[in-house]
Amino acid sequence: MAKDYVTGKKTTFGNKRSHSLNPTRRAWKPNLQKVRILVDGKPKRVWVSTKALKSGKVTRV
C-alpha cells in the first residue's frame, strides 16, 4: 500500500452507508503521484500527494 513520503498520508478505511444505513466497508485513498524529488541532495522517486505538490512542500527534479 502506497504512503505519502512527505505528509505520511495513506489509505483510510471506514463504512459506506446505504439509504437504509446498512454498513459496507470501503476505503478512502489519497491522490498519490510518483515523482522524482531531491532527498539528501540526490534524486529519488517517491509517492507524493498532489496536495503536497500544489502547496510547494516538495519540488520536482
Swiss-Prot record:
SUPFAM superfamilies reported for this sequence: L28p-like (SSF143800)
InterPro entries assigned to the protein according to its UniProt record, in alphabetical order: Bacterial_rp_bL28, Ribosomal_bL28, Ribosomal_bL28/bL31-like_sf, Ribosomal_bL28_bact-type, Ribosomal_bL28_sf
Ranges of biased composition (kind: Polar residues): 9-23
Listed name of the protein: Large ribosomal subunit protein bL28
Lineage top rank: taxon: Bacteria
Biological-process GO terms, alphabetical: translation
Family statement drawn from the similarity comment of this UniProt entry: Belongs to the bacterial ribosomal protein bL28 family.
